[in-house]
Each structure stands twice: as C-alpha cells, then as structure tokens.
Regions:
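Sec-dependent signal peptide recognition
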Residues: 1-7
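N-terminal pre-ligand scaffold of iron-sulfur
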Residues: 20-135, 174-186
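Flanking scaffold residues of small Cys/His-coordinated metal-binding clusters
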Residues: 8, 112-115, 139-140, 170
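A general structural-boundary detector
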Residues: 3, 106-107, 162
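Short Cys/His-rich metal-coordination motifs, predominantly Zn2+-binding knuckles/fingers
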Residues: 123, 148-149
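Polybasic, low-complexity binding patches
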Residues: 137-143, 151-185
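C-terminal motif of bacterial Sec signal peptides marking the signal peptidase cleavage site
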Residues: 12-15
Length: 186
C-alpha cells in the first residue's frame, strides 16, 4: 500500500507544471558573477533598478575567449565583457534561440527580475530559422521585430502592437539574482 501511494504521489507531482509560462523550446543557461564585474558593468548596474534591461549576446573571439556583448534598453549603450577567469571559462552558455536573451528588472512588479529570448516568438513559430532579433524601441520600453512589425512590452513580455499571431508574449525564462550570481535558465 505504501509503495502504491508513493508511486501515485510521484506520478501526480510529475504531472504538475508549476510554471507553464517558462519556455523550453530553446535552451537557456546563463550565469554571471557580478563580484568579478563590479559597477559600472551594465549587467551589474541593472540589478535593483526597475525598468532597466540589458540585451545579452555571446560570442567567442579568434583567441578562444568568450565575450558577452550587452546593450542597455534606456540609452542603447553597449559593453563588451571578456570572461577570462577560470570559473567563467568553465561555464557553458546557452542563450535561447540565437544566443541572445534580454534580462532586467520589471517596473510593473518592484524587484521582479525577468528574462526573455532575444528573438521574436511569432517569427520563430511562423518561419524557418532562428534569426528574428528584437530591438529596443520607445526609449527601451518596447522590443520590436522588424520582420513582422510586432512590439512587446519589456516589463511584462506581452505583445503591445501588431497582430496576435501564435504568441501573445515573449518566450520567457527563469531569472534570479542571489546577491552575487545573476542567472537565467529554463
């Protein structure tokens, strides 16, 4: 009887989906140690500031060094961050559909950290390929897709302009900051 009860509880727990708004279509695994990159680093400076977001892209240079390229929403300033410490070089980065995520603090819910895929969810669903980048618009409060002309509110992730399409919101990832490590994942 105890075994049957344990199996039933396990099945019920496995069937539950605590947060079905988290996208799992494209892998997201991002870790950033703010103690290694103090202010004025863009990613460190957005934390605790409602309405501040960064677009984060990754690439490896010709010397094999991984870099993060960030673009802030409120002034379009860019920064190139080299990840050179032993701890950083051992982390694998997966940034959604096309190596780009948007991460920041929503101004709608004080202190709520959010992360989105940097590609248009409707174009990812409607077309082949993965290169449908979102760009800052309206002083960084909207993310716009040039392909389908849809715009999304960066604070909520909800479509604010354009046809409804298949997705009314951006592809969303978990986001958390523990005081030192900034994470986004699915």
């Amino acid at each position: 009887m105890k075994r049957l009860l344990a199996v039933l509880v396990g099945v019920l727990l496995a069937a539950c989906n605590a947060d079905d708004t988290i996208s799992r279509a494209y892998r997201c695994s991002f870790l950033f140690d703010t103690s290694l990159h103090p202010l004025p680093c863009h990613l460190t400076s957005i934390l605790g500031n409602s309405g501040h977001f960064c677009k984060v892209q990754t690439y490896v240079d010709n010397k094999g060094v991984r870099h993060l390229k960030t673009t802030r929403n409120y002034d379009d300033a860019t920064e190139d961050i080299s990840l050179t410490t032993q701890r950083e070089t051992q982390v694998a980065f997966y940034l959604g559909a096309n190596d780009c995520i948007i991460i920041g603090v929503s101004s709608y819910e004080i202190g709520k950290l959010v992360a989105y895929d940097g590609q248009c969810p409707n174009c990812l669903a409607d077309y082949t390929g993965i290169n449908y980048p979102l760009t800052w618009q309206n002083n960084g409060q909207l993310l716009h897709c040039a392909k389908c002309d849809r715009s999304y509110d960066v604070n909520s992730g909800i479509r604010s302009r354009g046809d409804a399409g298949n997705h009314d919101r951006l592809l969303t990832y978990n986001a958390f900051f523990d005081g030192t490590i900034l994470r986004a994942w699915n």
